[in-house]
Swiss-Prot record:
Keyword set includes ATP-binding: no
A Gene Ontology term for the protein's cellular component: cytosolic small ribosomal subunit
Task of the protein: One of the primary rRNA binding proteins, it binds specifically to the 5'-end of 16S ribosomal RNA.
Native organism taxonomy: Bacteria, Pseudomonadati, Campylobacterota, Epsilonproteobacteria, Campylobacterales
Molecular function via GO: rRNA binding; structural constituent of ribosome
Keyword Coiled coil: no
Pfam families: Ribosomal_S17 (PF00366)
Protein name as it appears in the record: Small ribosomal subunit protein uS17
Domain of life (superkingdom): Bacteria
Source species of the chain: Wolinella succinogenes (strain ATCC 29543 / DSM 1740 / CCUG 13145 / JCM 31913 / LMG 7466 / NCTC 11488 / FDC 602W) (Vibrio succinogenes)
GO biological process: translation
Summary of subunit composition and partner proteins: Part of the 30S ribosomal subunit.
């Protein structure tokens, strides 16, 4: 079982919305080098994460792990809360 879990992607991001029940949206930032200009630029992507216990709030930094598809766009589940943020 631990061998299967080693291949699952782990993402870290900030909770930006908490709209539905047991679901949060996180914003993941990654830094890439521009192919032509060689400048480091930021790229952002939003992921829908399953939060079984409704524990996180907007502004929290969380870590999510890949799981089986739970809905059309939700295929990550909450792994742990890294830091608690201030809700805006």
């Amino acid at each position: 079982m631990s061998n299967e879990q080693a291949h699952k992607r782990v993402i870290q991001g900030k909770v930006v919305t908490k709209a539905g029940d047991k679901s949060v949206t996180i914003l993941v930032e990654r830094r890439v080098t521009h192919p032509k200009y060689r400048k480091i630029v930021k790229r952002f992507k939003k992921y829908i994460v399953h939060d079984e216990s409704n524990a996180v709030k907007v502004g929290d930094m969380i870590e999510a792990i890949e799981c089986r598809p739970l809905s059309k766009r939700k295929s990550f589940s909450l792994h742990k809360v890294l830091s608690v943020g201030v809700e805006a």
